[in-house]
């Protein structure tokens, strides 16, 4: 099934599209629309460095699982056609990130998080809930999500093993894309979220990253 949602899909069609998307994401069968950005030669890494790089890329992979589900949840409950399209476009670009992180995990002889089904389900539900708050808050939620993801990616660029340029190339491209998503949401009318909401989002993100690094 095509990732793009038909503009006039009925409720059953919409449900089938979301189920298909979830299955493709969770089964690791999604296909990137852009070329793999890692071009540097694979450098030798010590076992501890390899495990650390894999842990960070697993965190990034979970982040893309969550972004995929979050934006799909926001879009499915959003009544504004323009906002829906913006969310779906961002979700489609996140597929590239998802596939890139998965490929890098394989190169590092590692695996995605064992909890991915839970991350996806929870994020989809959160996206639906965010959409109920209205378009400005919905877009504000998207912008804040991307802002926090950018901060995580900056940290990963600092803490990845010095020799792991392949992972860095992926993370740099992801960071550029996330900044574009944030700017698009702000231009479309997203408003800043209240400080308590931003704090809750950071706390939830901290739990996710700490867990995904190991599991």
From Swiss-Prot:
Enzyme Commission (EC) number: 1.14.99.60
Enzyme class: oxidoreductase
Swiss-Prot/TrEMBL keywords: Cell membrane, Iron, Membrane, Metal-binding, Monooxygenase, Oxidoreductase, Ubiquinone biosynthesis
Matching Pfam families: COQ7 (PF03232)
Protein name in UniProt: 3-demethoxyubiquinol 3-hydroxylase
Binding site for Fe cation 1: 64, 94, 97, 178
UniProt main location, coarse: membrane
NCBIfam families reported in the protein's UniProt record: DMQ_monoox_COQ7 (NF033656)
Cofactor, how bound (note): Binds 2 iron ions per subunit.
A cellular component annotation (GO) from this entry: plasma membrane
Function: Catalyzes the hydroxylation of 2-nonaprenyl-3-methyl-6-methoxy-1,4-benzoquinol during ubiquinone biosynthesis.
UniProt similarity note: Belongs to the COQ7 family.
Biological or metabolic pathway of the protein: Cofactor biosynthesis; ubiquinone biosynthesis
Cofactor requirement: Fe cation
GO molecular function, one term: metal ion binding
This protein's record includes keyword ATP-binding: no
Bilayer topology term: Peripheral membrane protein
Gene Ontology process terms (BP): ubiquinone biosynthetic process
Known catalytic reactions: a 5-methoxy-2-methyl-3-(all-trans-polyprenyl)benzene-1,4-diol + AH2 + O2 = a 3-demethylubiquinol + A + H2O
Compartments (UniProt record): Cell membrane
Amino-acid positions noted as binding Fe cation 2 in the UniProt annotation, renumbered to this chain: 94, 146, 178, 181
């Amino acid at each position: 099934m095509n990732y793009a949602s038909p503009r006039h899909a009925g409720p059953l069609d919409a449900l089938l599209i979301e189920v298909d998307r979830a299955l493709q994401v969770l089964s690791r069968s999604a296909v990137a629309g852009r070329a793999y950005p890692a071009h540097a030669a694979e450098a030798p890494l010590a076992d501890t460095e390899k495990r650390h790089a894999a842990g960070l890329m697993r965190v990034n992979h979970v982040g893309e699982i969550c972004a995929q589900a979050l934006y799909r949840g926001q879009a499915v409950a959003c009544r504004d056609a323009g906002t829906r399209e913006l969310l779906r476009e961002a979700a489609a670009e996140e597929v590239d990130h998802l596939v890139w992180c998965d490929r890098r995990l394989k190169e590092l002889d590692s695996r995605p998080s064992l909890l991915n089904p839970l991350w996806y389900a929870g994020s989809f539900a959160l996206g639906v809930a965010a959409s109920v708050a209205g378009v400005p808050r919905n877009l504000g939620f998207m912008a804040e999500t991307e802002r926090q993801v950018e901060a995580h990616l900056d940290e990963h660029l600092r803490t990845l093993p010095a020799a792991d340029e392949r992972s860095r190339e992926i993370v740099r491209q992801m960071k550029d894309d996330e900044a574009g998503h944030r700017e698009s949401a702000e231009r479309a009318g997203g408003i800043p979220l209240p400080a308590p909401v931003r704090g809750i989002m950071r706390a939830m993100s901290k739990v996710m990253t700490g867990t995904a690094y190991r599991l």
